[in-house]
Amino acid sequence: MPPFISHFFLLSTFASLALCSFYCKNPGYPCLNGGTCLYNGECNCTSGFRGFNCGLDSSTISAACTVECHNKGICYNGDKCYCTKDYMGPTCQQAYDFADCNKSSMKIKAYRPTEFNGEMFLMQSMFGCKLAEVTSTIAGYKQYELDVPHDSTGPCKLKKTIDATTGDVHFEVNVSTIHHAGQFGMYDGLKTVSCHYSSRDQAIVKDVTNQDLIVSVTASDGSTPNLQEIPSNDVIHLTFKPVNLPGGYKAVKILDLEMYSVVEQWNEINSMVLLKDQCMTQKADELGYSVSNEVDGTSGRAILKAIPLFENVPAPVHFNYRLRFCRNRCILKSCASPSLKPMPKGEIFKHQGQGIRIV
């Protein structure tokens, strides 16, 4: 057969590959409990049985279950899960085809029945991008893997897209399965596996202090830097600036922030949690600290009112904090707005100035 005819046959066969994972005409995918394999690769179940392979006895389906079945799995016998055709495991938590999304690569993995004697490869290159069989981590299945670097430029190159707004990065690739080596048929499959790297998620959390030389922490009133004293009820700008972040990380934001004061002669300490999981706490709001959590370029900044923790005692305030480091830029979560507080009954309303007219 001339080479160009063979090449055309290969391309046209790829175009006809199916998208589903179970075909009873393929080795290792039988119809159970007396089910019949139809011409289209689906199972026709006998009375009382159901499911893609007729493997579920309808009389055993449980309304109450002691386990949680994932990915649309069905609970039976009270503590077991019958999975859909694309998932496996005790609670249907494991996909047959998936990827481990690593820092610099995408490791493609797949499980197949022990009767499987075919091949798996990336759609764009049958010969250069095969998944290799490795020692299986799940009994009763064969396991296949291929580790593809994110920056691969060869035949195994991944499809990469970047969200211009969020900076999120998405990699994907089509994985072909043929059930008879060197042969293509209408019951062979094609699956898309992907990795999504969110600019919010690509980060690490670390307890830090100034001695770690990872960030510098400065306090100001918005104009004068590195303040050591600030009048009560003035505004504090507390800035966390990256200095020597771990490899690959460029920006920082504040997760948690606590202010505390110690009066040594009384052996007492007072503290106030200002930010929790990036948002101002209800108590800080009620006591008037008016905390704002912000991102300024690569730095994280908290702006708050300077309210002493001890009345009439000049005790310095200190801060405990937890930070998140981000690879590109940090994006803050959306926090619920503080609730409006009604004026107590009998309170005389006082105001000064002409105010602002809202039009």
Swiss-Prot record:
List localization entries.
Secreted
Question: PROSITE patterns from the entry?
Answer: EGF_1, EGF_2, EGF_3
Give the signal peptide range.
1-20
Say which domain of life the source belongs to.
Answer: Eukaryota
Q: Where is the EGF-like domain?
A: 21-55, 61-93
Matches recorded under PANTHER family? EGF-LIKE-DOMAIN, MULTIPLE 7, EGF-LIKE-DOMAIN, MULTIPLE 7, 8
- What CDD domains does the annotation carry? EGF_CA
SMART domains for the chain: EGF
* SS bond partners: C24-C37, C31-C43, C45-C54, C65-C75, C69-C81, C83-C92
List the keywords (alphabetical).
Disulfide bond, EGF-like domain, Repeat, Secreted, Signal
Q: InterPro entries from the entry?
A: Dev_Signal_Modulators, EGF-like_dom
Q: In which tissues is it expressed?
A: Prismatic layer of shell (at protein level). Expressed primarily in the mantle with highest level in the mantle edge and lower level in the mantle pallium.
What main location does UniProt list?
secreted
Under the cellular component aspect of Gene Ontology, which terms does the record hold?
Answer: extracellular region
Question: Carries keyword Protease?
Answer: no
Name it. Answer: EGF-like domain containing protein 2
